[in-house]
């Protein structure tokens, strides 16, 4: 501890004296003064009377001081007796302190001993206020000084007082401990601390005493300097002092004191100066400046927000006033020191000033341009980690919802009145890491699209996180309360701002992992902000990835569900699902159980809108870019921000319709709440007892946002608060259905779970006899366990200590230990039975977080659930009776059921129908594909078979053609023979009719006949050859039939003829032809000769046969029958005659010079023969 000695001389004119800061303004520059002091080893002068106030020395000449006067050095040690008066420490000076000082200085200067002894006798009964560092202020105006400026000095010696009114005592210090007096009080405090390090040059006291006289002589010479330059200097000093580095260093070097003390400094001129909470001295103007005081009263008016009744009592005891114009009081922080200095003229006033309790409003000199907080009462403190003090200053108005790890409330500050969103989280060892992670993320995020973090409050059992209060709630709340979805313009505005927030988070290597409409909030100005960082993760770098399976099931990306490495692009998938939620009102696959739908997301195609045609192609394309299964192909947030869908600049006016509807709905609900409150208060006033003062009712008080509810009560922050709240039977009021309600774990969902458990228990009792049915029931139970709230955030892991058991209650330590032991035994048994099968059992904690654990035995489940039910009933009973020691979280209403929610059986039927339709459609496609493939195979096979057959049949066809050609070649000579035979027959007939003669005439006639017959037969042969050629061609193409089919029709009419031609040529003898036809069965008529001459070239016709068939290329067996002459036709003589005529006509036309008589004779003879043969 260092001491202070102040010396003051009251002899002199008050006109020549000036205040401390008026003399500071006369200095040319601070740097010159420091250089002059360091070069001349000058020292500051201390002046003090027996009072506790600083006064200006008024000595006019150095003759008042002894010529060889040197002050004694301060003693090394002194013990001070302290007494507590009025809440502050006032230190009394020891009577023997100055005697010790004088005895130590007798060896140096005997002349000064007498003066010191006289002064010590006068100062036996005076008081001295001590600070942690001693300050000396000299405002001497005497002439003859070298520096001409007042000095401020601090040292670590004891403090002695001097009460003489006639003489002036000055104590000099070492030059390294001096500071320039033109630095104001705040700069003095900082630089005095730095000078306290150098305390080794105490041997220069005599030189400094000699220089002090010269310093006093120059004071009056510099009083008339230019004030304009001094004002410039003070401005520079103010800028130097106001730097934050200077204040931090000065505060860090100050020693701490356990008390809160006041500082009062007075001058003889009526002006006063005060100290700041850190001991820095600031000036006060004198009574000569009343106008300046009036101008600055409004600026220095004490704000009412810092008033508190506890601090008010303490400050009333410690504050003291002498006169309103000369004194001031300051209540500083607990670390600030105090200094009370008064003059002998005001000692009587200091003893009686405790009676008057009037706080004087402080002002400051306009020339200094320094503003320091005055009359400040410490209400709460925020350190560099943003940890607050003052838990009871906040009031929780209503519960806004449940986050990933805690419940969110609306809170207001009692004194300041500002509103915040307070997230109340129960302190658990298992969740400490996640809590610290969330706080670190919020602390480092500073973006207009991210919820701001204002600090945290911590108790033994809970921690409060102070966040932005978004009055309009989340997008999910707006959709539920208004029962309307967003249009394209509104979706683009929300998505664009959400993307900006995600881009900022990803630039900080943060993955949100829970992007959904319930976590996108709207402030009063429709600013979009991302909230709830309970499951977020900060990666180590841009290339780092995460593997943890966490998030809300229906919003999770496929790579997160498959537990693959994923990065910030998982948030883009969640943003796409959020777009569907804003457009359709609900996320996709909401009709299915959330866990089952989550498992099917990687297998199903990416989801789309319920009605894609309802939305523009740009929005559909934007959604398709977000919902790409492959994260590498998925678009980045920067690419999506440049998408044409988001190019239009849309402001918050787009949401005006929804906001207006929201406020109308909330006004109606608030009016209903008021009516209910009035009705309840009227009933409770007649029956219930008066409430405790801690509980407040805000039934008619609607906050600035118009969203506050009726009854409020703070969460107990300490054991004392819990005792205060013991008599409170009030609970936190909750918002009504759809009003500012976050989707999460709703406590009323426990009833639904209990009903399921009861039904399962009954089923198990009925099926105990059949083991197979028990296994089926177990499978059904596992499926039913997956039916959880699809809007709750899910964390998948093996174990989590301290988590809830599905009912929001907290189990005791013994229960936790028992559960851990049972879980260990169960795990060992399961591993022995089947290591691959892991049955998951979902549980929901009080904060809305769904925890996935390994399956427990049924007995342990039932016992834990029964315990939880008992705990819930006990807590409800206590809260109703008014003896609730712990705060009970309010119940949330049931979530709005979706319009198409149906029973489980209908869901299974729908699944079956969907599966069947899907299978049918897929089967139809497969069948059509198979048919097409079969047709192609058939065509290809047929083509191959045709090619092979053609290749194999080609030699057969060639052989047939060769056979036909051979037949043709063989048939030609036979036909020639037959024709020759026919001609011979004709010749014989002709020759038979006249007598044969050997005359040359007859020979010539015969020769002529032969020539004519040859000539006539030649064209016939040519025709027959052409017919044969055409017949061969047609036979190759037509189907070949066997000869038996044709010959069977002619078996009865077949004939055989034998011709014996005996030609003899002798001397002038003629040739004769003998025809002896031999008939088998039936005689061939002579009409058949016609057919022999015009027979076709078919291989069936031959000259040897008795019949000649007219068979063309397209003839058939019916044609053959048609041309065969039947006996009935032969019987008809007329028909025979006509045919004979036709035959004769043909022969006459065919043979040019043949005589008709011959032909008729021959034909008649032939016909007669045939008729006779037929008759036979």
From Swiss-Prot:
Chain residue ranges for the region called Disordered: 1-231, 254-361, 670-723, 753-885, 968-1083, 1112-1176
Task: List, separated by semicolons, the cofactors it needs.
Answer: Mg(2+)
Q: Which GO terms describe its biological process?
A: intracellular signal transduction; protein phosphorylation
Which residues, by range, are in coiled-coil regions?
92-133, 812-873
Positions of the catalytic residues: 514
- GO cellular component term, pick one: cytoplasm
Q: What InterPro entries does UniProt report for this protein, alphabetically?
A: Kinase-like_dom_sf (IPR011009), Prot_kinase_dom (IPR000719), Protein_kinase_ATP_BS (IPR017441), Ser/Thr_kinase_AS (IPR008271), STE20/SPS1-PAK (IPR050629)
Q: Where is the composition biased (Low complexity)?
A: 1-19, 32-52, 93-125, 133-148, 156-172, 198-226, 316-353, 682-693, 710-720, 991-1044, 1051-1066, 1148-1176
Q: Which GO terms describe its molecular function?
A: ATP binding; metal ion binding; protein serine kinase activity; protein serine/threonine kinase activity
Q: Which reaction does it catalyse?
A: L-seryl-[protein] + ATP = O-phospho-L-seryl-[protein] + ADP + H(+); L-threonyl-[protein] + ATP = O-phospho-L-threonyl-[protein] + ADP + H(+)
Enzyme class (EC, first level): transferase
Q: Indicate which residues the UniProt annotation says bind ATP.
A: 400-408, 423
Top-level taxonomic group? Eukaryota
Q: Enumerate the Pfam families for this protein.
A: Pkinase
Which keywords does the record carry?
ATP-binding, Coiled coil, Kinase, Magnesium, Metal-binding, Nucleotide-binding, Serine/threonine-protein kinase, Transferase
Q: Where is the composition biased (Basic residues)?
A: 852-870
Q: List the EC numbers from the record.
A: 2.7.11.1
What residues does the CRIB domain cover?
A: 370-383
Cite the Protein kinase domain residue spans from the record.
394-646
Q: Where is the composition biased (Polar residues)?
A: 173-197, 254-289, 873-884, 968-985
Q: Where is the composition biased (Pro residues)?
A: 64-76
Q: Does the keyword Nucleotide-binding apply?
A: yes
Similarity section: Belongs to the protein kinase superfamily. STE Ser/Thr protein kinase family. STE20 subfamily.
Name the PANTHER family on file. SERINE_THREONINE-PROTEIN KINASE PAKE-RELATED, STERILE20-LIKE KINASE, ISOFORM B-RELATED
Q: What is this protein called?
A: Serine/threonine-protein kinase pakF
Species name for this entry? Dictyostelium discoideum
Query: Which lineage ranks, top first, belong to the organism behind this chain?
Result: Eukaryota, Amoebozoa, Evosea, Eumycetozoa, Dictyostelia
Which gene is the coding source of this polypeptide chain? pakF
